[in-house]
Structure formats: C-alpha cells, structure tokens
Amino acid sequence: MEQSTPSQSPPVSRRTVLKLGLVGLIGVAAGAGSTAVIAGLGRKARPKYRFFTDAEGALLIEICEQIIPHDDVPGATETGAIHYIDRQLCGVFARHQQTYRRGLESFRQTCLEIYKMPFEELSGSRKFEALRAIELGSAPKALWSNPPPQVFFNLVLAHTMQGFYGSPRHGGNRDYASYRMLGLDYPPVTGRNHRREA
C-alpha cells in the first residue's frame, strides 16, 4: 500500500529561491582536473568517488538535483556539487562521513518502504514528497535513529549550496555557473593587490 506525505508545489521555483540571498556561500576544497586514459598501461580505472560508493553517489546525485535542478542554467549535477561533497568528506567534512553513509541508507530504505521502489526511479512529484518527508521529520521513525532525518536533509542542503556557490577550485560550481546565473563578476584571488597605480 502506497503511503505519501502531503504534497504541495512550492510557491516559487527552486531556481528563484537560489537567487535570493545565497550569494555568500563558500566551499572549501580544491577541484580536480580531468584524468587522461592511456591505452596499454594496464592501469586500473580511477574510482568515480573518493568516499561514496557508486550506489551512494547515484542516490546523492538525484537528491542534489532536486535541490538545485537543471533548467535554463546548469543544476547540481553539471556544476559538480556531489564532487565537492565527496572531496570534503575526505577532508574538512570527515566528521560527517557516518551521517552521510547512514543517512543515505535510511533514505533508501524510506523510499522502498513508502513507494516500493528506489528514489532514483520515482517521478518528480514523488521525489519532492520523499525529500519533503525527511525535511519535516515525518519519515518513518523506525528507519531513522542516527542521524535524524532533518539533520541529514539540512546537511545535504547546506553542502549542495556550498558546492553550487563556492569557488570552482573547491570542486563544485563548474565553469562559474552560479556566478554567471547571478550576473556576478568572478571573485578576486585572495591576497592579490588590486590597488590601481597612481
């Protein structure tokens, strides 16, 4: 039997919300360049993620894309928000590793319990419902002990925003997508002297 939480369309688009007052979010880790694949060297392919498993990464991508969807400008996927999160979990965000690992598993189980299918296979409206349930803390409590659903949701929300708005050198905001969306100049390099010559 399918169970769902009350669903209402947000009064404004998520893209509009992203443009209101979120310019100051900053990321904290270096981005990575592309990896050349050289035939004949017998090297193992580099793993897709530093911390996440492929299954965890696929689920988190879907969550991040609901938070910052693709429309007329790139969303969370194209701007590399998940790679920002993945890299930071192996550095300054290491204390959040278990929150992500347990939270993703609890969220996976929540979707199977309520909708009888993985989050990745749900319709857009069902995905919104599922995320709304953990945002409000109305997900099945038996599946959420540590972390609580709201703690997990707020952490993913904050880190997704940081990955979208931070400097590309930190692993997200590929091609300065958020700055271009907001019509901002690229920020100056810290420490550079910008005083004009007299």
Regions found by a protein language model. Name each.
Residues 2-4, 58-62, 66, 73, ...:
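Mature-region segments of soluble proteins
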Residues 20, 24-27, 67, 106:
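Short alpha-helical scaffold segments that flank and stabilize functional sites
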Residues 5-25:
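N-terminal secretory signal peptides and thylakoid transit peptides that target proteins
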Residues 24, 31-32, 141, 170:
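Short, polar/charged, Gly/Pro-enriched helix-capping and turn/loop motifs at alpha-helix termini
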Residues 17-21, 43, 85-88, 176:
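Short low-complexity stretches enriched in small and charged residues
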Residues 10-16, 29-67:
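C-terminal segment of N-terminal export signals and the immediately downstream linker at the start
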